[in-house]
Amino acid sequence: MEVATLGGGCFWCTEAVYKRVKGVISVKPGYSGGHVPNPTYEDVCTDTTGHAEVVQITFDSSIISYREILEIFFEIHDPTTLNRQGNDVGTQYRSIILYHNEEQRKIAEEMIREVEKRIGKKVVTELKPFEVFYEAEDYHHDFYDKHKYNPYCRLVISPKVKKFMKLFPDKVKIHEG
């Protein structure tokens, strides 16, 4: 098992996508990258904690690699917009990769260079060592699956999930049930 901690805008979006990725064991929304201990959602929304909305992904690296996790990451959000994803604005929505070891750091640096070359734009994704993860409040967990008809879910999250499924059909987890 390996862990990845990533922020690509609203954590409801990234959680919804990664829950559907083959090889992903669990996805938890939360806060990381800042300086205030034990922040709440309300604290993070003040733009003063330094934390970003992130997801902590536990995955089976024999099924999906960290590089593949990042390939999906760079497709499901815009890594060229600073402190913003769509209409979600603030440092809590910044693009961030919190690496857990040197191998993850090297892969992330390589991926950032590749994405910049491919799209011809500067990637503003922050890259820093992982320190601590604060799990989000219960009502943020599985938000998309619990509220599919919520306007934000329909207009913002659903297109990201569909984009993932279209671009990475071989990575889609077969839904049981």
From Swiss-Prot:
One of the Pfam families matching this protein, by short name: PMSR
HAMAP family: MsrA
Keyword Oxidoreductase: yes
Name of this chain's protein: Peptide methionine sulfoxide reductase MsrA
Function: Has an important function as a repair enzyme for proteins that have been inactivated by oxidation. Catalyzes the reversible oxidation-reduction of methionine sulfoxide in proteins to methionine.
Gene3D superfamilies cross-referenced by the UniProt entry: Peptide methionine sulphoxide reductase MsrA
Reaction(s) this enzyme catalyzes, per UniProt: L-methionyl-[protein] + [thioredoxin]-disulfide + H2O = L-methionyl-(S)-S-oxide-[protein] + [thioredoxin]-dithiol; [thioredoxin]-disulfide + L-methionine + H2O = L-methionine (S)-S-oxide + [thioredoxin]-dithiol
EC number: 1.8.4.11
Record's keyword terms, sorted: Oxidoreductase
